[in-house]
Amino acid sequence: DAINADLDLIYISLPISMHEEWSIKAAESGKHVLCEKSSTDSFNSAKKILKSCKNNNVRILEALAFRFHPQHTKIKQIINDELKEIQNFYGIFGFPPPPQNDIRWNNKLGGGVLNDVSCYPICASRLIFQNEPISVSSNLEFDKKLSVDKSTNASILFPNDKTAFISSGFNNYYQSKYSVWGSDAKITTKRAYSVSRDSETSIFLHKNDEISEIKITPADQ
């Protein structure tokens, strides 16, 4: 099997509830780990995984591929040139309900919007602020029948009084975007978290009562 094979890295695409077990097994076999998001479903689980990777001198990367799309490099450039002092981040990611038999609705397998969807705008806010949160205040709407969260709203406080506002859900009109509000301008994305390799996307700069569109050519992230 993969654990015993002559490999340098193992990609773990199992349900979230199984990530801890197999990430640790991979690390203990001396293999680097590429683990699907969310890498785990609890803080304690994350600590166990990181400890195992450190003890076995291997690396782990959470597979949030959107980070490698070139639009985000361009966004950072625009922030430095046009927005100046960043104040707030607003991230939205949601879509209509998946089928009832979809793994996202299975709480025993790590389902729920917080694990499956909220991780995207949360990750984006950390990339934009280039810092880690100080505190989080959130509310989750649960599907009582399935015992999983179907929508999440959160306010995340970062150092230097920066704040990220996050909304995500399984019961929404499709949206995949974020905006950054700065002292001199605002920037918004057209499609932030799921851009197909053959699709172009756009960034919109709001400044001096004008909106400028910056097109980003297709890219394989």
Language model region names:
Residues 179-221:
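C-terminal glycine/acidic-rich active-site capping loop/insertion
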Residues 1-34, 38-52:
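Beta-loop-alpha module in the N-terminal Rossmann-like domain of NAD(P)-dependent dehydrogenases
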Residues 123-196:
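Contiguous beta-strand/loop segments that form the cofactor/metal-binding neighborhood of enzyme cores
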Residues 29-31, 55-59, 162:
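A short helix->loop->beta-strand "cap" motif at the edges of active sites that frequently abuts
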Residues 30, 102-109, 206-211:
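Short glycine/proline- and charge-enriched loop/turn segments
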Residues 35-36, 60-62, 189:
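Hydrophobic residues in well-ordered beta-strands that form the structural core
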Residues 66-145:
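Predominantly a Rossmann-like dinucleotide-binding segment in NAD(P)-dependent oxidoreductases
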Residues 48-65, 84-91:
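Rossmann-fold dehydrogenase core element
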